[in-house]
Amino acid sequence: MTIVVTGAAGFIGSNLVKGLNQRGITDIIAVDNLSNGDKFHNLVDCEISHYLDKHEFLHLLLDGEYEGELSAILHQGACSDTMNHDGKYMMDNNYQYTLALFDYCQHEEIQFLYASSAATYGKGTVFKEERQHEGPLNVYGYSKFLFDQVLRQRIKEGLSAQAVGFRYFNVYGPREQHKGRMASVAFHHFNQYREHGKVKLFGGWDGWENGMQSRDFVSVEDVVKVNLFFLDNPGKSGIYNLGSGRSQPFNDVAEATVNACRRHEGKPALTLAEMIQQGIVEYIDFPDALKGKYQSFTQADIAKLREAGYAEAMLSVAEGVDRYVDWLIGRQG
């Protein structure tokens, strides 16, 4: 049986393809939009059986081309640029496309795992998979929220096959280089340090000290493991937060990135205070454009994920960033 991965050349999608390969699974249809041609690099070291453009795939799927051949669709393909304000494009790409795949999977009794987002919570301070805590602030978040609402209703009515949505928090790790400004802070810090010998962070604002704004940073390694756990457990459906379950300040990311780079340079680790004193960590004024629109704190409540049976420990920023820097240096030299 064949597994479909949409967004397969993207960040999380390509890591999922690699994770499936590591299990010996290569009968994979990779679906994506390679208008950004550089994304193909993410699949060069992966094994797939076929590639299709996302529009061609949906057309063939609904025409019955793959009837009886698919075991699962891992749907990671979407417009993830939170600054894209084209509502029609966002809803067509993120909501309608997801709905079409979901309906097909229910009809054909195929497992369906898809990417939701922590953007569904908006400026909330409680990050728990419950309606009262949700309030997206942009059309990207709304497109994800709306399909989550559809799934909730369909679960009440009764599903014919597994359907799982993952609310990804701040994911970082290998194969994100094509994302440009939307890539993780760890990726940008790595490049800043390698090019300039220092990294830049937002200074304090709204009661937060320099670099102390915090996020739930989750390694893509853990994201892949959780996806595969649910693939192995087709009886579990629902919407789940996928973060580390801990909030860590941007200072931690800077410190971890710099020290991982220094390790490769044969230099001793430094404390954050030493980095600041030596000018390696530099704080810039908090941008006026972000004031009032910026989340200074996120932390996934992963109790529901644990209740579903996923018991593995999540990587800390220090652990995950260290491994990520090893990978980046291995690729870039």
Swiss-Prot record:
Q: What is its EC number?
A: 5.1.3.20
Q: Which Pfam families match?
A: Epimerase
Q: Which residues form the active site?
A: 140 (proton acceptor), 179 (proton acceptor)
List residues binding NADP(+): 11-12, 32-33, 39, 54, 76-80, 93, 144, 171, 179
Listed under catalytic activity are:
ADP-D-glycero-beta-D-manno-heptose = ADP-L-glycero-beta-D-manno-heptose
Q: In which pathway does it act?
A: Nucleotide-sugar biosynthesis; ADP-L-glycero-beta-D-manno-heptose biosynthesis; ADP-L-glycero-beta-D-manno-heptose from D-glycero-beta-D-manno-heptose 7-phosphate: step 4/4; Bacterial outer membrane biogenesis; LPS core biosynthesis
Disulfide bond annotation, renumbered to this chain: none
Q: Does rRNA-binding show up as a keyword for this record?
A: no
One of the GO biological process terms: ADP-L-glycero-beta-D-manno-heptose biosynthetic process
The signal peptide stretch is none
Cofactor: record remark: Binds 1 NADP(+) per subunit.
Residues reported in the UniProt entry to bind substrate: 170, 181, 188, 202-205, 215, 294
This protein's assembly is summarised as: Homopentamer.
So what family is this one in? Belongs to the NAD(P)-dependent epimerase/dehydratase family. HldD subfamily.
HAMAP family reported for this sequence: Heptose_epimerase
Q: What is the purpose of this protein?
A: Catalyzes the interconversion between ADP-D-glycero-beta-D-manno-heptose and ADP-L-glycero-beta-D-manno-heptose via an epimerization at carbon 6 of the heptose.
**Entry's free-text remark on domains:** Contains a large N-terminal NADP-binding domain, and a smaller C-terminal substrate-binding domain.
Q: Which NCBIfam families match?
A: heptose_epim
Stated name of the protein:
ADP-L-glycero-D-manno-heptose-6-epimerase
